[in-house]
């Protein structure tokens, strides 16, 4: 007896129809070889719909009727990616005026790969770089159970219901080698023909058309009503396996692609391939660039990957991108337009960026009205002026920039000039004997552009430090533009993560002078928010076009009690978000301060090296310059920030307002990075090699006191230390090192963390029963440990939860210790 014979007739027919319709859909969408007429497919589809409507309990998880969508959702749930969805580094091959490509960046990529493989000869797979939306598909026992967007690479949104409406995504995998679990990464996009049809419908219905297929695909996939998504005709192409259990385990990426096709996925047939060397790769890239207009989908380049998965593993990753792959972008699309004006934008750090205001022009799929001119040197080099006809490019197909001026089209004017009498005298126009045409010359209508001397926002002087390309407004937090941008950064998710306080609210608070400094955020109360809202509403009502309505957004919701306006929950949510963010991790707090050159990674390094805010505030510049990934320029910027009385006062004000950055164990002891031979070489105004610095240290009795007082030390050292500022610096260094924990103390942790955690490398895999991944990571890092994304021989512990995959298998193979969540907590206590 087969499976169907054991069922009742209705269940049997539902199974038969589901299998039939899925097979027919595969033939139509993937093989492009339908075996039945459309009318017959529609008849069978309607039969299945009727059976499922009358017997919903018999509906199968891979039923093709799910592709029509369902009732709207209230919102999208978050999905934590088991394996982060990383980005790729970009490489460009600019063309000269004869259309010849300069492939220097790709040859450099090939050389880096070869160096990483110790001279090995890699094969490469080249695929189209689709201009769509990256998603991840999770299948268990062959059935699609979850689909998620990329999000920030770590956390995305659950779009399973919408993805099930995409016709060429199999709801159940095909073939004989179906894995127990597989997570497929790929791109959702909209074909050019479907995009044109969608925009025609939008126009006919009086709705705004989409700017490009990518925007249409992204907007369609994130519809809360999956029935709308179903109408939009999205398409999917797979490009990688994130994790897999069972099934056919490939050894090469080209085998993965073939496996995708066997499982029922569509591939961009004819537009990908495997090549033996970089020369063949580049020839195929140029072929694809020529073929680009004919393709049924938008691409903005190709993706080049090392074919061997073992070689991919050997090469590994750098930062947030793999070393074994690169996005080889096509030359950006360009267009001509006219510069109508040039003004400046003021950034968070006071950076003054000249911006060209342009006649609207369609470039690279979007309408461009502004383009960056980068800085004064670039404006002068390109000689961009108001009225010029310019070539505009979307650099990297993202940021519009002015490439060059078409000087032949520059607007000119005739101006009178003095005329020589031939013997060295100048005649004025009244007595000139030459024709009038010779008494004038054609000169540009507009003068060369120069940055203003003062900030257009706060009228502070614009200054440019020697050696710096960027000019900056000197107003600091006195400048409204810098205040707003600084506060937006301070409250952002990666900084203080103040939930509920968005850019529009901060801009309103600053514009109305209700908030001037970081600490002012912690003094906000209901009356302040109410005043902000009322002023925003007043501005909205006075705006003829109604554009200001979005400024207050959800702030416009009010309840009325006893005839008096009362703020609704939005205000209380903002206050709750401010209150809950008062105890940030030290690294987040340092990043939030907006110190120039200090990003997330540098902030984390500072936290790991010093453990407390007070130590960071007092860290001498030579010590800072010794830290990993922190050079002289960054160290000087950090030291300068904390040397300013107003910045120290600002931090004190935050602490007084109740902000309390969390101290953490020192996982990067000073002895590991700031040996005396290193910080001595970084003393300002004293040039010495590390070998001579070590000798000087030994002559001084291996103590800072000796450096301060020993009169037998070399004359050049005694001359240096005799200066008052250097005497003070040595005293500061002595005090600082005395307060830092020793290497043994650091290993134990500043608050008693034992050696099993501090300095150890952990890898998290699977779903933990209590903690989210980022919570567990925060606990480990606060205890002085490090969290890595991949398992290697250097891994100390793997913490495994439910559905732990290949990382657990690799840990067992390498003999790495595996912990449960409970065992991790025991280790941390």
From Swiss-Prot:
GO biological process, one term: DNA repair
Catalytic reactions of this protein: NAD(+) + (deoxyribonucleotide)n-3'-hydroxyl + 5'-phospho-(deoxyribonucleotide)m = (deoxyribonucleotide)n+m + AMP + beta-nicotinamide D-nucleotide
EC number, UniProt record: 6.5.1.2
Region listing for Disordered, in residue ranges: 534-564
Binding site for Zn(2+): 455, 458, 473, 479
Pfam families on file: BRCT, DNA_ligase_aden, DNA_ligase_OB, DNA_ligase_ZBD, HHH_2, Nlig-Ia
Entry-linked PROSITE patterns: BRCT (PS50172), DNA_LIGASE_N1 (PS01055), DNA_LIGASE_N2 (PS01056)
One cellular-component annotation, GO: cytosol
Keywords from the named record: DNA damage, DNA repair, DNA replication, Ligase, Magnesium, Manganese, Metal-binding, NAD, Zinc
Cofactor annotation: Mg(2+); Mn(2+)
NCBIfam families: dnlj, PRK07956.1
Function, in words: DNA ligase that catalyzes the formation of phosphodiester linkages between 5'-phosphoryl and 3'-hydroxyl groups in double-stranded DNA using NAD as a coenzyme and as the energy source for the reaction. It is essential for DNA replication and repair of damaged DNA.
Protein name, entry field: DNA ligase
Organism encoding this protein: Neisseria gonorrhoeae (strain ATCC 700825 / FA 1090)
């Amino acid at each position: 007896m087969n499976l169907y014979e054991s069922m009742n007739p209705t269940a049997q027919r539902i199974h038969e129809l589901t299998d039939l319709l899925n097979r027919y859909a595969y033939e139509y969408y993937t093989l492009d070889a339908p075996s039945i007429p459309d009318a017959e497919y529609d008849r069978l589809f309607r039969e299945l719909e009727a059976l499922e409507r009358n017997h919903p309990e018999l509906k199968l998880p891979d039923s093709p009727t799910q592709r029509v969508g369902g009732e709207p959702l209230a919102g999208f749930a978050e999905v934590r990616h088991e394996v982060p969805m990383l980005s790729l580094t970009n490489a460009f091959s600019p063309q000269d005026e004869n259309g010849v490509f300069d492939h220097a960046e790709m040859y450099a990529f090939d050389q880096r790969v070869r160096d990483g493989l110790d001279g090995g000869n890699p094969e490469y797979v080249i695929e189209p770089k689709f201009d769509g939306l990256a998603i991840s598909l999770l299948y268990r026992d062959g059935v699609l159970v979850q689909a998620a967007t990329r999000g920030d690479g770590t956390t995305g949104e659950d779009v399973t219901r919408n993805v099930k409406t995409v016709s060429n995504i199999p709801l159940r995998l095909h073939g004989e080698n179906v894995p127990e679990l597989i997570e497929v990464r790929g791109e959702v996009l909209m074909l050019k023909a479907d995009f044109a049809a969608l925009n025609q419908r939008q126009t006919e219905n009086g709705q705004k058309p989409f700017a490009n297929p990518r925007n249409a695909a992204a907007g369609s996939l994130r519809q809360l009503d999956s029935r709308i998504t179903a109408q939009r005709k999205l398409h999917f192409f797979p490009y990688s396996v994130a994790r897999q259990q069972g099934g056919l385990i490939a050894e090469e990426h080209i085998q993965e692609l073939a496996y995708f096709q066997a499982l029922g996925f569509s591939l961009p047939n004819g537009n990908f391939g495997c090549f033996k060397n970089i020369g063949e790769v580049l020839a195929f890239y140029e072929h694809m660039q020529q073929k680009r207009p004919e393709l049924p989908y938008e691409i903005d380049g190709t993706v080049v990957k090392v074919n061997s998965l073992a070689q991919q593993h050997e090469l590994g990753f750098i930062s947030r991108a793999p070393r074994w792959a690169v996005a080889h972008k096509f030359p950006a699309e360009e267009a001509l337009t006219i510069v109508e004006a040039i003004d400046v934008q003021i950034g968070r750090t006071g950076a003054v960026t000249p911006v060209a205001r342009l006649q609207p022009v369609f470039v690279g799929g979007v309408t461009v009205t502004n383009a960056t001119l980068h800085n004064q040197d670039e404006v002068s080099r390109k000689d961009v002026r108001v009225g010029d006809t310019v070539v505009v490019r979307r650099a990297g197909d993202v940021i519009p920039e002015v490439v060059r001026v078409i000087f032949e089209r520059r607007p000119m004017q005739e101006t009178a000039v003095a005329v020589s009498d031939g013997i060295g005298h100048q005649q004025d126009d009244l007595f000139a004997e030459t024709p009038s045409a010779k008494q004038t010359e054609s000169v540009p209508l507009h003068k060369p552009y120069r940055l203003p001397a003062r900030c257009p926002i706060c009228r502070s002087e614009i200054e440019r430090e020697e050696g710096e390309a960027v000019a900056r407004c000197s107003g600091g937090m006195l400048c409204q533009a810098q205040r707003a941008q600084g506060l937006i950064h301070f409250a952002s998710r990666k900084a203080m993560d103040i939930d509920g306080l968005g850019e529009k609210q901060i801009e309103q608070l600053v514009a109305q002078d209700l908030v001037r400094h970081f600490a002012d955020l912690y003094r906000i109360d209901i009356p302040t928010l109410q005043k902000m809202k009322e002023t925003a509403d007043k501005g909205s009502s006075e705006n003829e076009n109604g554009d200001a309505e979005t400024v207050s957004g959800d702030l416009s919701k009010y309840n009325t009690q006893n005839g008096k306006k009362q703020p609704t929950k939005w205000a209380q949510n903002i206050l709750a978000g401010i209150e809950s963010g008062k105890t940030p991790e030290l690294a987040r707090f340092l990043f939030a301060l907006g110190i120039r050159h200090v990003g997330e990674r540098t902030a984390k390094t500072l936290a790991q090296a010093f453990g407390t805010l007070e130590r960071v505030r007092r860290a001498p510049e030579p010590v800072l310059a010794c830290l990993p990934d922190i050079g002289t320029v960054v160290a000087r910027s950090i030291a300068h920030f904390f040397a300013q009385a107003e910045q120290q006062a600002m931090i004190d004000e935050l602490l007084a307002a109740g902000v309390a950055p969390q101290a953490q164990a020192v996982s990067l002891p000073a002895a590991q990075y700031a040996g005396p031979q290193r910080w001595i070489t970084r003393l300002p105004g004293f040039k010495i090699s590390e070998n001579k610095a070590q000798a000087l240290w030994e002559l001084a009795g291996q103590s800072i006191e000796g450096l301060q007082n020993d009169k037998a030390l070399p004359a050049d050292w005694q001359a240096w230390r005799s200066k008052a500022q250097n005497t003070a610096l040595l005293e500061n260094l002595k005090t600082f090192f005395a307060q830092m924990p020793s290497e043994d103390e650091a290993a134990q942790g500043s608050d008693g963390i034992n050696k099993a955690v501090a300095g150890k490398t952990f890898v998290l895999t699977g779903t933990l029963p209590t903690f989210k991944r980022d919570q567990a990571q925060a606990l480990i890092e606060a205890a002085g440990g490090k969290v890595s994304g991949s398992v290697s021989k250097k891994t100390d512990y793997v913490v495994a939860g439910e559905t732990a995959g290949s990382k657990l298998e690799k840990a067992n193979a390498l003999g790495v210790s595996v912990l449960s969540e409970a065992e991790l907590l025991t280790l941390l206590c």
